[in-house]
Amino acid sequence: MKLKKITLILIIILAVLVLIAGAATFTSNNSIIETPKGNASVVVTGDVMFARNMAGVLSLDESPFRHVENVTGSADLLLINFENAATTSGCAVKGDVPLKCDPSYVPLAKANNNTVAALANNHLFDYGTDGMKDTLKSLDDAGITHIGAGNNESQARQTASSDINGRNITIINYMDSNNFKEYSTDVMPQANGSNPGYSAYDSDVAKCQIQDAKANGSDVVIVYFHFGNEYSHSPNPDQEKMAHEVIDYGADAV
């Protein structure tokens, strides 16, 4: 009887040890192990414009990026400023230097499978709101993500987000409304409420968007501005102020 009690006690102890070991294994197997994040490459261009004398080149159906495609095509993400309307409209609303291209050329701007086109610039609305809508449709049809302009403020303020090798990259696009003041808001409209337009820089909006992106797990936030004086090689005080503001709000690159 005594032997049975000892045997029973040993069985209970062994069972407890097995449970403890199992619990330890369970805890170990279910602990959060952070997956290492890989590198992510982003190529950023300046103005990409298919207007003026570009039609003769584009009609050859060759990539305008062919001499740099080893750079633009090999990156994980390509960010461009698409600086013209893509429309067949002949009704320019801007009297000087209106820029447009035929919508059929838009796919040539996709020099990378992951291409983002920034539209907050001073030529998107050269052919009015209809020209802007034609441009958005052409970019959608070409599979190019677009930011910085839209049919309303919510659409214009949308950001682009990509998950690359375990890293989340968010891109935000603004234009400085202090530039090009010679044009009325009818010619160069700022998106406001339900009204179409470009995404104008607003300090409070930028702070909210950047901090929201970070709070939602974005590893890298890029703010892509269209600002500064044309043909100038140095930043003006407004540019410096805005750049420092968004960096203070948490932007990683400007």
Predicted regions and their residues:
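Acidic, metal/ion-coordinating pockets
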Residues: 8-254
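Short, low-complexity patches enriched in S/T/P/G
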Residues: 1-9
